[in-house]
UniProtKB/Swiss-Prot annotation:
HAMAP family according to UniProt: Ribosomal_uL24_B
Function: One of two assembly initiator proteins, it binds directly to the 5'-end of the 23S rRNA, where it nucleates assembly of the 50S subunit. One of the proteins that surrounds the polypeptide exit tunnel on the outside of the subunit.
InterPro entries: KOW, Rib_uL2_dom2, Ribosomal_uL24, Ribosomal_uL24_CS, Ribosomal_uL24_KOW, Translation_prot_SH3-like_sf
Cited SUPFAM superfamilies: Translation proteins SH3-like domain
PANTHER family (alphabetical): MITOCHONDRIAL RIBOSOMAL PROTEIN L24
Taxonomic superkingdom: Bacteria
Keyword rRNA-binding assigned: yes
BP GO annotations: translation
Region of interest (Disordered), ranges: 45-77, 96-115
A Gene Ontology term for the protein's cellular component: cytosolic large ribosomal subunit
Name this polypeptide is given: Large ribosomal subunit protein uL24
Length: 115
């Protein structure tokens, strides 16, 4: 999965279609993301020492990563994410629509010839 925490995304499917928000959490094992303000549900909480009031909590639930698209920082429109290698051998994410860099993923690997 190419999403990272704090990426701005737009929901493209489901009840919250069209909602924009930042990614709060990424679960790579289940291929799910938690988007700020989207997929909100009421969670009923029993009284306990940790939560003496009890009651209902409104919280964001995870949604499938296939239901969101990254918002291109330069155009503000949804775009796919690509990965490319730079000249120094490091990997970076980029917006496929505009080609703008979204940040480095991995540093350059040390060559085996140097050792």
């Amino acid at each position: 999965m190419k999403f990272r925490v704090d990426d701005e995304v737009i929901v493209i499917a489901g009840a919250d279609k069209g909602h924009r928000g930042k990614i709060l959490k990424v679960d790579r094992d289940k291929d799910k993301v938690v988007v700020e303000g989207a997929a909100r549900v009421w969670k009923h909480v029993r009284q306990s020492q940790k939560n003496p009031q009890g009651g209902r909590l409104n919280k964001e639930m995870p949604m499938s990563a296939s239901n969101v698209m990254l918002v291109d920082p330069s155009t503000g429109k949804p775009t796919r994410i690509g990965v490319r290698y730079l000249e120094d051998g490091s990997k970076e994410r980029f917006a496929k629509a505009s080609g703008e860099s979204l940040g480095q993923i991995a540093p350059a690997k040390a060559s085996k010839a140097a050792s």
